[in-house]
Design a protein with these regions (language model features):
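An acidic-aromatic
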Residues: 69-120
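Short, surface-exposed coil-to-beta transition loops
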Residues: 55-58, 79-81, 147-151
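Short, solvent-exposed coil/turn segments at beta-strand boundaries
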Residues: 37, 62-68, 86-90, 132-140, ...
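Bacterial Sec signal peptide processing site at the extreme N-terminus
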Residues: 12-34
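Post-signal-peptide N-terminal segment of Sec-exported extracytoplasmic proteins
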Residues: 35-75
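Non-transmembrane domains of secretory- and envelope-associated proteins
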Residues: 21, 95, 132-182
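Sec-dependent signal peptide recognition
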Residues: 3-11
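Charged, gly/pro-rich active-site loop segments
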Residues: 116-136, 140
Length: 182
């Protein structure tokens, strides 16, 4: 009888040893989890004209109200060549083609261009909430002795979308002074 009990115990231990173990997932700190925002995403076409040169580009504008604006410029085949990230305090311009980026406050940025660019204007451009309410926007900025005219054709209004929007990591780009671009 005791021999049978020992055999049953050994068989149960072998069966229990072959069972799968539950894996406990690691605890992720709250700071490292990106939060969801309601983001207005717009695709548009922009035409940039400078001293006899005309460039057409597709742009994607993402705006999280009163927080972040991201403008991606894709002049050919959907390849992002330039990215502009703006917060209410600063503007980050990333040139992916040359591997460079520059950070500037609106004060520094506006020392080199006219008319002045503000957070409010940038947010209105990206969300197509311009005062005239039209489907086209025409902007003209001058820096150094060069004038850039930008025409934006907005598509039909796109809906707010829940999205995780993150700033582009700049550690893989070389930081330069904004005046080298302006």
């Amino acid at each position: 009888m005791t021999k049978r009990i020992y055999i049953y115990i050994v068989i149960l231990m072998m069966l229990a040893g072959c069972g799968t173990k539950k894996k406990v997932s690691p605890i992720i700190p709250q700071e490292s989890v990106p939060t969801w925002h309601t983001c207005l995403i717009r695709n548009a076409q922009a035409t940039v004209e400078t001293e006899g040169m005309k460039v057409n580009a597709n742009i994607t504008m993402q705006a999280v109200r009163d927080s972040l604006v991201v403008i991606s410029v894709m002049p050919m085949m959907g390849i992002e060549m330039m990215r502009i990230e703006a917060t209410p305090k600063e503007v980050i311009c990333i040139d992916k083609l040359h591997g460079q980026y520059a950070v500037a406050t609106y004060e520094v940025f506006n020392q080199h261009i006219t008319p002045k660019l503000t957070w409010k204007i940038l947010q209105e451009i990206c969300s197509a909430e311009l005062p005239n309410g039209q489907a086209k926007a025409r902007l003209q900025y001058t820096f150094k002795k060069q004038t850039i005219e930008i025409q934006i054709q907005y598509p039909e209004r796109q809906l707010d979308t829940p999205i995780r929007i993150q700033k582009q990591p700049t550690h893989k780009y070389t930081k330069i002074d904004i005046t080298q671009w302006l």
